[in-house]
Amino acid sequence: MTMTNAAISAVSEMAIEEIRRKLDDDGYCLVPDALDAKELETVRLALDRILEEDDAAGVALRYGPDGANQRVWAMLNRGEEFVRLATHALGLAIVRSGLGPDIQLSNLSANVTGPGGNREIGRLHTDQGFLPEPWPYQLATNVAFFLDDFTEENGATLVVPGSHRTLTVPDHGLAPSAPMRLTGKAGTMAVWDGRLHHATGLNRTPDQRRRGIFATYIRPFLRTQENWCRSLDRHLLDRHPELSALCGFEEWQTLGGVNGARQSGLNF
């Protein structure tokens, strides 16, 4: 993806090195205006269409109080707009600053919190809790794009600053501080360490949705949450060759060969 003017502006205001320091210290960072107004509106319209389609087809994945919240998985298959988010130049640069040059996209999903909740939706968790503790180093990074303003009232993501340094899931040991909400304007990109304790927040508003697109990236030797080899639309690999490595279709060092041999991509 060509870096947009909005992304270039964001880099000029907060260099990747400064973002990296913020991530190392607090476990999270907010980058305002990562999406410009046109990009934001395009993604919003595409997501709203998908939500309506899933509802009409009876396949909407709803959760939380009264089913007010909705999740959509495998967003790469749902539109070019979401491929562009997964390959967002600034987002990938920040991810690689922590995980190294070779990364995989573990999942890409939409998460919408609906109004009227009366309790927190998500349980505090990390995104590398499937690995033995204590963790030797960071193995995952999350990138979220705010499609609406994320506020104290409408379900902004909860995080525990500094909790990535505990090297354990939230159930093990005492959190270093109380949870806070990642608030920001629509178009903001939030990035957080996969070890950071976080959760979906409670939407206390009577009539507001909180829409976001969430990507998780991992080191290349880990298994992805979404099995792209089974679910990815193969035509996307022709249109977006960069997805081949990002979705685990390429070898990495001695892993992922075919019949013991290395090859570029897979033929279907």
Regions found by a protein language model. Name each.
Residues T2-D26, V31-L131:
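Non-heme Fe(II)-dependent double-stranded beta-helix
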Residues L30-V31, F145, A190-W192:
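Short hydrophobic-aromatic micro-motifs
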Residues E81, I94, V143-F146, A199:
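Short, hydrophobic/aromatic alpha-helical segments in well-folded domains
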